């Protein structure tokens, strides 16, 4: 498909009609981190569970200075009506308000620009719908992570929150997060960091795992 973003690309400063009115994307993001996530259609089962979970986790994203914004090829009017179903699914009052806006991309302009269309999933007119895309942008407006799911597989928003924790931690410290890492657990010191410098940067200690190769690349430290 034409369009699309690669890691490190700056987010296009697009304009869009949303459930909070007309926006410019860079103005919407401000100095925050941002997550732009698309879904195939309003009033569908998997999408309802996804946005319901995103709504429940919205306070956790806000604590991390992350703004959420959703997108689909449905109209703002549909977004408002569907929001009632999402809130009801969450056991809340069936209002039109969600803790994040949803973009109206019924002409598919943004879906094409950002490479979000799923050619395997079509609407009633035979046109491709948006896939389950997740873009995470840093305060510099650059793409830090992208994930693409097919329509049949719902996303894990707890995992997306975990990824945000990793991205924010590693943006300000010379560390990486190992497999299955969770916030508060030990992290790995980057192999490029000299040993003496690592000791100075991480006063809680640097612990090296001995390996048959004799190479000292598995270095752990408590989370800074």
UniProtKB/Swiss-Prot annotation:
Positions of post-translational Phosphotyrosine modification: 89
Required and sufficient for targeting to lysosomes and lamellar bodies, as annotated region: 31-40
Positions carrying Phosphothreonine: 44, 177
N6-succinyllysine modifications at: 209
pH dependence: Optimum pH is 4 (for phospholipase activity).
Domain Thioredoxin: 5-169
Residue numbers carrying N6-acetyllysine: 63, 209
GO cellular component, one term: cytosol
Pfam families: 1-cysPrx_C (PF10417), AhpC-TSA (PF00578)
Catalytic residues as annotated in Swiss-Prot or TrEMBL: 47, 140
E.C. number(s) listed in UniProt: 1.11.1.27, 3.1.1.4, 2.3.1.23
Mutation effect (residue 26 to A): Abolishes lipid binding
GO aspect biological process, one term: hydrogen peroxide catabolic process
More details: The active site is a conserved redox-active cysteine residue, the peroxidatic cysteine (C(P)), which makes the nucleophilic attack on the peroxide substrate. The peroxide oxidizes the C(P)-SH to cysteine sulfenic acid (C(P)-SOH), which then reacts with another cysteine residue, the resolving cysteine (C(R)), to form a disulfide bridge. The disulfide is subsequently reduced by an appropriate electron donor to complete the catalytic cycle. In this 1-Cys peroxiredoxin, no C(R) is present and C(P) instead forms a disulfide with a cysteine from another protein or with a small thiol molecule.
Function comment: Thiol-specific peroxidase that catalyzes the reduction of hydrogen peroxide and organic hydroperoxides to water and alcohols, respectively. Can reduce H(2)O(2) and short chain organic, fatty acid, and phospholipid hydroperoxides. Also has phospholipase activity, can therefore either reduce the oxidized sn-2 fatty acyl group of phospholipids (peroxidase activity) or hydrolyze the sn-2 ester bond of phospholipids (phospholipase activity). These activities are dependent on binding to phospholipids at acidic pH and to oxidized phospholipds at cytosolic pH.
Family stated for the protein in its record: Belongs to the peroxiredoxin family. Prx6 subfamily.
Protein name: Peroxiredoxin-6
């Amino acid at each position: 498909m034409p369009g699309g973003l690669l890691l490190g690309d700056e987010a296009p400063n697009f304009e869009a009609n949303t459930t909070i009115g007309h926006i410019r994307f860079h103005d919407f993001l401000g100095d925050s981190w941002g997550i732009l996530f698309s879904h195939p259609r309003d009033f569908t089962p998997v999408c309802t569970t996804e946005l319901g979970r995103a709504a429940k986790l919205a306070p956790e994203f806000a604590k991390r200075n992350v703004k959420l914004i959703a997108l689909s090829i449905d109209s703002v009017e549909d977004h408002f009506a569907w929001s009632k179903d999402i809130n009801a699914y969450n056991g809340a009052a069936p209002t039109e308000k969600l803790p994040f806006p949803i973009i109206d991309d019924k002409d598919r302009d943004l879906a094409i620009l950002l490479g979000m269309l799923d050619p395997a999933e079509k609407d009633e007119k035979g046109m491709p719908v948006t896939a389950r895309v997740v873009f995470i942008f840093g305060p510099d407006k650059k793409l830090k992570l992208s994930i693409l799911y097919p329509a049949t597989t719902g996303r894990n928003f707890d995992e997306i929150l975990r990824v945000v924790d990793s991205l924010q931690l590693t943006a300000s410290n010379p560390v990486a997060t190992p497999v299955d890492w969770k916030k508060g657990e030990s992290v790995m010191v980057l192999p490029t960091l000299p040993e003496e410098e690592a000791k100075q940067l991480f006063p809680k200690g640097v612990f090296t795992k001995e390996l048959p190769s004799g190479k000292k690349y598995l270095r752990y430290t408590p989370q800074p």
